[in-house]
UniProtKB/Swiss-Prot annotation:
InterPro entries linked: AP_endonuc_2 (IPR001719), AP_endonuc_F2_Zn_BS (IPR018246), Xyl_isomerase-like_sf (IPR036237), Xyl_isomerase-like_TIM-brl (IPR013022)
Species, as recorded: Geobacillus kaustophilus (strain HTA426)
CDD domains per record: AP2Ec
The keyword DNA repair is assigned to this record: yes
GO molecular function list: deoxyribonuclease IV (phage-T4-induced) activity; DNA binding; DNA-(apurinic or apyrimidinic site) endonuclease activity; phosphoric diester hydrolase activity; zinc ion binding
Keyword Hydrolase on entry: yes
Cofactor note: Binds 3 Zn(2+) ions.
Keywords assigned: DNA damage, DNA repair, Endonuclease, Hydrolase, Metal-binding, Nuclease, Zinc
Its job: Endonuclease IV plays a role in DNA repair. It cleaves phosphodiester bonds at apurinic or apyrimidinic (AP) sites, generating a 3'-hydroxyl group and a 5'-terminal sugar phosphate.
Annotated family: Belongs to the AP endonuclease 2 family.
GO biological process, any: base-excision repair
Protein name, UniProt field: Probable endonuclease 4
Binding site for Zn(2+) 2: 145, 179, 214, 259
Amino acid sequence: MLKIGSHVSMSGKKMLLAASEEAASYGANTFMIYTGAPQNTKRKSIEELNIEAGRQHMQAHGIEEIVVHAPYIINIGNTTNLDTFSLGVDFLRAEIERTEAIGAKQLVLHPGAHVGAGVEAGLRQIIRGLNEVLTREQNVQIALETMAGKGSECGRTFEELAYIIDGVAYNDKLSVCFDTCHTHDAGYDIVNDFDGVLEEFDRIIGLGRLKVLHINDSKNPRGSRKDRHENIGFGHIGFAALNYIVHHPQLEDIPKILETPYVGEDKNNKKPPYKHEIAMLRAQSFDDQLLEKINAGAE
């Protein structure tokens, strides 16, 4: 069965219930949340996340598996500012607790940025941070995300992710989130040779570690190292390649999460594309008028 959904918002008093309601309105059977704003560390207590009501709604709507994404501000690759590193370690520990409480198994993490110290120093610092965070007892896996290589990001290549995994003591608590836009922008040819890319991933990291897919088109050509998401079928990856990935038999059991941009010229009135993109991928048929239809208020 195809597991497909999108990033949804967990906010207000409803929190997890609101997230599940939004996902169900898109026809999704999985979804991804941030436990608070991705740009800061302000978080509600576990008791305020409305977990029980959210889980009941999920069960009633056939949503079994959800994913949590750690905030962007965590940087355990920072060797120059140890306060930033320590904040990342402490916050990641708390985020694992929240993820466990919600009942999610995967916590997606941007590995980190070396901020000028060099890739090797950044990778070693990420290993150090993960070794401080991970415990034998935890059930949650941290899913290291494949990165585009923008700025000083670490994790652009499969080899870099494998290096991190190999250096971590409890690396059974590590998995990988494969982002289509990021891997494309990092230089992997997922358009013409996705099977070859998947074989390379399996050889270097192992397909058994692949636990989350972020399905995004890209505004930029392959190898641009930009990381700018585009709506499904309207970018440089294209619908055919993304549809092939979404329905790939080796990836059937992996949740596929859309993080494509909201649609509209008016910044204050942009519309989510997810209901339409999910339907399009389920039908395996591209609608080149989709963005106009969403703009026009298509239900």
